[in-house]
Amino acid sequence: MANVTLFDQTGKQAGEVVLNDAIFGIEPNQAVVFDVIISQRASLRQGTHAVKNRSAVSGGGRKPWRQKGTGRARQGSIRSPQWRGGGVVFGPTPRSYAYKLPQKVRRLALKSVYSEKVAENKFVAVNSLEFTAPKTAEFAKVLAALSIDSKVLVILEEGNEFAALSARNIPGVKVATATTASVLDIANADKLLVTQAAISKIEEVLA
């Protein structure tokens, strides 16, 4: 079992938290992490690209000239693909790029990125993040006390609305819960700031 220093909101040590090695101490599988990140990035694509094919382009209903006798190549419509202003052949149409990977693959990827952050000492555990009201300045003080000045993913327990609202307007800070933190978000973050309750939930979900 890996031990991680537990801090409070003021940056002082408040003990240690024991992490489950089956989740936070495995050998990262980079191939699986790569596959899941590609999948999650694909699902973020809007897929709203569209062009007009020859049936959608305005005009072109009349044959431009008669079939025979002009000496010119036969044409059926001025909106054929070879014409300027004609329809596009096999152009992109709106579609979803999302695809699913097996649950075992996604869970292994989560365990891999969590383990990597712990191994690189980029996993900061805090006993709680309690605020009486949404205060961005107060959350900024917490980050400063914990010496976090880079891209950070804050992983909270469910229902901690004040902490989530306090953090979301700070540049470089992204907020998620133990059940919504994605492999892409975790991999992109320079550090993870995780509450003790969120750690317990992560271990419950991925056990």
Swiss-Prot record:
Instruction: List the Gene Ontology MF annotations in alphabetical order.
Output: rRNA binding; structural constituent of ribosome
Alphabetical GO CC annotations of the entry are: ribonucleoprotein complex; ribosome
InterPro entries found in the cross-reference section: Ribosomal_uL4, Ribosomal_uL4-like, Ribosomal_uL4_dom_sf
Region Disordered: what ranges?
A: 49-78
Q: Which SUPFAM superfamilies match?
A: Ribosomal protein L4 (SSF52166)
Keywords of the record:
Ribonucleoprotein, Ribosomal protein, RNA-binding, rRNA-binding
Organism domain of life: Bacteria
Please give a single GO biological process term from the UniProt record. Answer: translation
Q: What Pfam families does this protein map onto?
A: Ribosomal_L4
The subunit structure is: Part of the 50S ribosomal subunit.
- Outline what the protein does: One of the primary rRNA binding proteins, this protein initially binds near the 5'-end of the 23S rRNA. It is important during the early stages of 50S assembly. It makes multiple contacts with different domains of the 23S rRNA in the assembled 50S subunit and ribosome. Forms part of the polypeptide exit tunnel.
Tell me which family the UniProt entry assigns to this protein.
Belongs to the universal ribosomal protein uL4 family.
The protein's name is Large ribosomal subunit protein uL4
**Which source organism does the UniProt entry give?**
Streptococcus suis (strain 05ZYH33)
- Identify the coding gene: rplD
